Amino acid sequence: SGGAGAQRGVDIQLKRKGFHLPEFAERVRASDDYALLEDREWVIEAIFEDLGAKHSLYEAIEPYLSADALLSSNTSTLPLASLLEGVPEARREKFAITHFFNPPKVMRLVELIASGSTEAALRTTIEQTLGKIALECRDTPGFIANRVGCYWMAAGVARAREFDVSYELADAAFGRAFGIPR
């Protein structure tokens, strides 16, 4: 089940010290019981990058969300317009993409692709409650991070080849220096 899969993810993060403090894992509840969403102000969908699966999940959880609840996707590749096709009309003004940079416990940036009242509400939550930096993005392929990141990595590989630098050395030299935690 999805809840069991999510729990395995929590267990893996505990082993890898993925939480700032181990007790933070107690705040994560892995479950298939969508009724647990009824009183939530913000629900973040973070399942695999399959548009049909995301649409199915939105349809399944919609009856449990309050009218005011914000819903966002942590996608890093799917366009907002495509995701909105699976979101009920009444929820669309409360929907956005909130792409958290990985690993989120270290990286402060969150790409925000939204419209209407959702953008202001999520920006406030991201910045004031989570202590992160919200980057407003247009609904373009790869948003900002993947577009720049892919170019940056490709340029790094090209320069490493050009100057006969091993990939391991290039990675060690630039990873942490540019804020890449691993």
Labelled PLM ranges:
Residues 29-31, 176-180:
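A short structural micro-motif
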Residues 59, 67-147, 151, 172, ...:
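Rossmann-fold dinucleotide-binding core
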